[in-house]
Curated annotation (Swiss-Prot):
Gene (UniProt): ybeY
Location(s), subcellular: Cytoplasm
Family to which the UniProt record says this protein belongs: Belongs to the endoribonuclease YbeY family.
InterPro entries, per database record: MetalPrtase_cat_dom_sf_prd, YbeY, YbeY_CS
Phylogenetic lineage: Bacteria, Pseudomonadati, Pseudomonadota, Gammaproteobacteria, Moraxellales
Cofactor: Zn(2+)
Species per Swiss-Prot/TrEMBL record: Acinetobacter baumannii (strain ATCC 17978 / DSM 105126 / CIP 53.77 / LMG 1025 / NCDC KC755 / 5377)
Gene3D superfamilies (UniProt xref): Metalloproteases ('zincins'), catalytic domain
Protein name, entry field: Endoribonuclease YbeY
Length: 158
C-alpha cells in the first residue's frame, strides 16, 4: 500500500512537531487494521482556531472550533478505475484545540494528535460515532486497538 500525504501546516507549534514519516505510519496502521489495502491519498491541514471555527460553522453548523474535521472524497464510481490512488479525503486538525485538549486530558500533544488522526481517518473510511451508540462503541474500540499498535495508551481511560 502506498500512501500519498499532502500536509499543509498553516498553523505550527513548537509543542507539536509533525513528521511526515510518523503521520504516514499512523495512517497506514489505521488502514491496515481495518483491512484497507489500496494505494490512497489523504490531505491533512493544520489550522488555527479561527479557521477551524469557520469550517465547523459552515459544514456542521457548530459555532465553535473543533479538534478534527473530516471531509471524505466524493469521487464518482466511473472515475475510480482511472486513478492510480484513491483519494480518501481531507482532514482539518486545529492545533490549538489539540494542545488545549492534551493539556486538559493530561496526554502528550503527540499522542493526542495521533488519536485524532486515527479518528479522522476512520471517518474518511465511513465510520461514524454520531449515528448510534453501537457505532460509537465500534469506532472507539477500533481507535483503542489501533493506538495500542502504536504504543499509545487507551485515550478513553482516565
Amino acid at each position: 500500500m502506498k500512501i500519498s500525504l499532502s500536509l499543509q501546516q498553516d498553523f505550527q507549534s513548537p509543542e507539536l512537531e509533525l513528521k511526515r514519516a510518523q503521520l504516514k505510519k499512523i495512517i497506514e496502521t489505521t488502514l491496515r487494521h481495518v483491512g484497507y489495502k489500496e494505494d490512497c491519498e489523504i490531505g491533512i491541514a493544520c489550522v488555527d482556531l479561527e479557521e477551524s471555527h469557520q469550517l465547523n460553522l459552515q459544514y456542521r453548523e457548530k459555532d465553535k472550533p473543533t479538534n478534527v474535521l473530516s471531509f471524505p472524497s466524493d469521487i464518482p464510481e466511473e472515475v475510480l478505475p482511472m486513478l492510480d490512488a484513491l483519494p480518501l479525503g481531507d482532514l482539518v486538525i486545529c492545533i490549538p484545540v489539540v494542545l488545549q485538549e492534551a493539556l486538559e486530558q493530561k496526554k502528550t500533544a503527540q499522542n493526542h494528535f495521533a488519536h485524532l488522526l486515527v479518528h479522522g481517518v476512520l471517518h474518511l473510511l465511513g465510520y461514524d460515532h454520531e449515528t448510534s451508540d453501537e457505532d460509537a462503541e465500534e469506532m472507539e474500540g477500533l481507535e483503542i486497538e489501533i493506538l495500542a499498535k502504536l504504543n499509545i495508551a487507551n485515550p478513553y481511560q482516565e
